[in-house]
From Swiss-Prot:
InterPro entries: Domain_X, Maturase_MatK, Maturase_MatK_N
Claim: RNA-binding is one of the keywords in the record: yes
UniProt similarity note: Belongs to the intron maturase 2 family. MatK subfamily.
GO biological process: mRNA processing; RNA splicing; tRNA processing
Record's keyword annotation contains GTP-binding: no
Protein name, as recorded: Maturase K
Localization per record: Plastid, Chloroplast
The protein's role, per its UniProt record: Usually encoded in the trnK tRNA gene intron. Probably assists in splicing its own and other chloroplast group II introns.
Pfam families, per database record: Intron_maturas2 (PF01348), MatK_N (PF01824)
Keyword annotations of the record: Chloroplast, mRNA processing, Plastid, RNA-binding, tRNA processing
Chief location of this protein within or outside the cell: plastid
Gene transcribed to yield this protein: matK
Listed GO MF terms: RNA binding
Length: 503
């Protein structure tokens, strides 16, 4: 019991109570906008004194709490012209600074946790592609997978209550409550409001969303560890914090008084893998369908009865891994069963042995990718290249460099694909779209433009690995076939390419 209590309790020494006064510090807004600390963020008028920034912040906060925000005096609209351009501008300015402030307790807690545990601080950036070698190694031994969309909180007040155990300043919590209702304007959070909120203030949205996800993941990790002899190992960092003390005490009561441990014992699964990405997560396990269904209803009950998030059990599908394709980070991944027949003969008896080998494959989903190219005006709905509108003063070299950079980024991102044929089609679209855009900017025909540039223009669209490998290996059929089927994972990619982010 003491061991579990120590696992769940949080040291209060790193909790700071006074965050609201930081809103009146100019450097907070400099950090929020990545500006220099000696530059004013709230206004561009040189006639203002920098010392009056706190007064402007006070005026903005006062205006936010007014019932009718559209009524401004003519004098104020002249002196504060930046307020009249957009009715949500003053709210957005304060919310961007507030997003920096609420991150402070979590950042201090993380630093304190690393120092207390004497963990080596890694300054290397983690690559998105580092997850794929892990999946190639683990998924071939698993049988079932569930792809789940993480539910949002129904009531906005739950997000505020989540942060109460970190942010003790009531003024900051009231301001956060105002921001949530300002953007969503409803007790129910539809997807369109969440999308608008994420675009209006992505930093604050990501902070609230990650705190919501970390809340349920921490309890799920705790209960998962009690359900198996093997402790789970995580490749990420979980913040140790207070997770609804009343609910934690309820967990202890159920766990120890109602023989809950025996119930979890039936869920024992030492081969479960949990991966979260883009508002979704999937559970993969080497287990029976019955136990996967038990974990399914267990998660639903955890969300509904302990986190008040409405979630239907029918939205969680349990699929056999070799029959299911997983859309993951711009790839479509699946496990294929490749059969190999071995003929062996012992004396006069002939034996045929059929072995089924599992292979993890990652392919490029060409239809969604062409849809992204269509939205970016590189091609039409059928995948035919078109001229992308460009600035009239752009030179040919600027247009070509921009297309080359897009093509190189896509090639690097999808270099781990099992089949490169669809990737070559994307290169073809970008190459001809570049020619059409440059010819339109130069008021010439495509034929004339290509003839003027020569064959060197086409060679520039080769990626770095294709150029290097073509110099090392001879141009034989077997070599080109191996390069076509080979996986090349770039371990320096830290963000999802915009064209592969279909959602």
């Amino acid at each position: 019991m003491e061991e579990f209590q120590g696992y769940l309790e949080v040291d209060r020494s790193q909790q700071h109570d006074l965050l609201y006064p930081l809103l009146f510090r100019e450097y907070i807004y400099a950090l929020a906008h990545d500006h220099g600390l000696n530059r004013s963020i709230l206004f561009e008028n040189a006639g203002y004194d920098n010392k009056s920034s706190s007064i402007i912040v006070k005026r903005l906060i006062t205006r936010m709490y007014q019932q009718n925000r559209l009524i401004f005096s003519s004098k104020d609209s002249i002196q504060n012209q930046f307020i009249g351009h957009n009715k949500n501008l003053y709210s957005q300015i304060i919310s961007e600074g507030f997003a920096v402030i609420v991150e402070i307790p979590f950042s201090l807690r993380l630093v304190f946790s690393l120092e207390r545990k004497e963990m080596a601080k890694s300054h290397n950036l983690r690559s998105i592609h580092s997850i794929f070698p892990f999946l190639e190694d683990k998924f071939t031994h698993l049988d079932y997978v569930s792809d789940v969309l993480i539910p949002y909180y129904i009531h906005l007040e739950i997000l505020v209550q989540t942060l109460r155990y970190w942010v003790k300043d009531s003024s900051s919590l009231h301001l956060l409550r105002f921001f949530l209702h300002e953007y969503c304007n409803s007790l129910i959070t539809p997807k369109k409001h969440i999308t608008f909120f994420s675009k209006g203030n992505p930093r604050l949205f990501l902070f609230l969303y990650n705190s919501h996800i970390c809340e349920y993941e921490y309890i799920f990790l705790f209960l998962r560890n009690q359900s198996s002899h093997l402790r789970s190992t995580s490749s990420g960092i979980f913040f140790e914090r207070i997770y609804f003390y009343v609910k934690i005490e309820h967990f202890f009561k159920v766990f120890f008084d109602n023989n809950f441990q025996c119930t979890l014992w039936f869920f024992k699964d030492p081969f479960m893998h949990y991966v979260r990405y883009q508002g979704k997560f999937f559970l993969a396990s080497k287990d029976t369908s019955l136990r996967m269904n038990k974990w399914k209803y267990y998660l639903v009950n955890l969300w509904q009865y302990h986190f008040y998030a409405w979630f239907k059990p029918g939205r969680i599908d349990i699929n056999q891994l070799f029959k299911y394709s997983l859309d993951f980070l711009g790839y479509r991944s699946n496990v294929r069963l490749n059969s190999s027949v071995v003929r062996s003969q012992m004396l006069z008896n002939l034996f045929l042995i059929n072995n089924a080998m599992k292979k993890f494959e990652t392919i490029v989903p060409i239809i969604p990718l062409i849809g992204s190219l269509y939205k970016a005006n590189f091609c039409n709905t059928f995948g035919h290249p078109i001229s992308k509108p460009t600035r009239t003063d752009s030179s040919d070299s600027d247009i070509i460099d921009r297309f080359l950079r897009i093509c190189r980024n896509l090639s690097h991102y999808h270099s781990g694909s099992s089949k490169k044929k669809s990737l070559y089609r994307v290169k073809y679209i970008l190459r001809l779209s570049c020619v059409x855009x440059x010819x339109x900017x130069x008021x010439x025909t495509v034929r004339t433009f290509v003839k003027r540039l020569g064959s060197e223009f086409l060679e520039e669209f080769l990626t770095e690995e294709e150029v290097v490998l073509s110099l090392i290996f001879p141009r034989t059929y077997s070599t080109s076939r191996r390069l076509y089927r080979g996986h090349i994972w770039y371990l320096d990619i830290t963000s999802i390419n915009d064209l592969v982010n279909y959602e």
